Amino acid sequence: MRLLQVTALFFLLSNSLCRGENSKALTETSTTKASATTPDMVSITNKSTGGTPPKGTTNSATPKTPLMPALDSPTTPKHETTTRGVIKNEVSTIKTTVANPTISNAVSTLSSPQNKTENQSSIRTTEISGTNQLPDDQKPKTTETPSASLTTAKTISQIQDTEDGKITATTSTTPSYSSVILPVVIALIVITVLVFTLVGLYRICWKRDPGTPESGNDQPQSDKESVKLLTVKTISHESGEHSAQGKAKN
């Protein structure tokens, strides 16, 4: 991470130094006046007493025809007019964010400082003239939006494909579960019905058997009769003993 930070700082410093050199060379060589009509326009009047004008100011009128950026041709013809004495400059500051990457790319690709200054001046003129419009190839928004839409469409189609695959998988698996569960449930129901019918038939047959209920009813009656006989015998035996004892006493 530290190495990345150090390299990033190094690149930023090198870019800033290159831009500073290019701006100095531009102020020494280019002395053109530019005016732009934009909705957010701020007019600034700068007065200098000779030498070079301040940064970002020019002193000659630009042609009325729109200037196209000349990035491909490093050597472009320039029309320069130098004046001496008191100079009155009118500058309009324009907020542009499209030409900044083109400037950095142009500065980084070129090798000699002369080519850098020439390309910088040509790009600067296109920046200052607000009526100029970049072609469709150099607009980052027009080039980025189709790719973004294509990527979003691809991702949406992939998501839809995956969702369709999941849905088909679930539909294919649900019949398998039902085909396994339904026979098991039917078999359990049949087994329970058979068990209940067998138990009912056994009970009906056991009730209809003639021997079992009579024997069951006779057993308690015979027991009662045997108990009665035993009680009668004991009572008669005791009465006989009592009579024998009474006779003996007499």
Swiss-Prot record:
Residue positions, PTM Phosphoserine: S226
Biased composition (Low complexity): 24-38, 45-60
Main location: membrane
Record flagged with keyword Signal: yes
GO CC, alphabetical: plasma membrane
GO MF entry, a single one: carbohydrate binding
Membrane topology: Single-pass membrane protein
Residues of this chain annotated as glycosylated in UniProt: N46, N115, N119
The protein, known as: Endomucin
Compartments (UniProt record): Membrane
GO terms, biological process: angiogenesis; cell-cell adhesion; hematopoietic stem cell homeostasis; regulation of cell adhesion
Region Disordered: start-end pairs: 24-83, 105-153, 210-250
Transmembrane segments: 180-200
Signal peptide: 1-20
General function of this protein: Endothelial sialomucin, also called endomucin or mucin-like sialoglycoprotein, which interferes with the assembly of focal adhesion complexes and inhibits interaction between cells and the extracellular matrix.
Keyword Coiled coil: no
